[in-house]
A protein has these predicted regions:
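Active-site beta-loop-alpha junctions enriched in small/polar residues
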Residues: 11
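Acidic/glycine-enriched connector segments
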Residues: 2-3, 14-125
Length: 125
């Protein structure tokens, strides 16, 4: 079976694990029948860490791509996003409408032709 690589990413204040499970289960419901699902995570808190939890609960392979802040400084998150998009087939982003990092992930995934699902949520004020 071929792999289907999906990024689960989003804002760092995202904490609604039930919503993440519902969205991801729906998005992957057909692919899981014909592919090995691989969850790709940037390793940040919030949506990324919930995506890792989801992968473990569902028995999916997990690939972690943590940003190398020491090496790349402020550009590390953007470099990580590009690295993840280069190996992914799709991207599910949980976005508060403000996070620049999540917006960058959405933009780069879209530019690279990935199937992108954006889940807007209110965020924490």
């Amino acid at each position: 079976m071929d792999n289907f690589n999906v990024i689960i990413a989003g804002s760092r204040d995202f904490a609604d694990y039930e919503l993440l499970k519902i969205v991801c289960d729906h998005m992957l419901s057909e692919k899981v029948k014909t592919h090995n699902i691989v969850i790709i995570s940037g390793g940040a808190r919030g949506a990324d860490s919930l995506g890792e939890q989801y992968a473990k609960e569902r028995g999916y392979e997990l690939q972690s791509h943590p940003a190398d802040w020491d090496k790349y400084g402020k550009s590390a998150g953007y470099r990580r996003n590009k690295e993840m998009a280069e190996v992914a087939d799709a991207c599910i982003c949980f976005w508060d409408g403000q996070s620049r990092g999540t917006k960058h992930m959405i933009d780069i995934a879209t530019d690279m032709g990935l199937k992108v699902k954006i889940v807007n949520y209110g965020g924490q004020k």
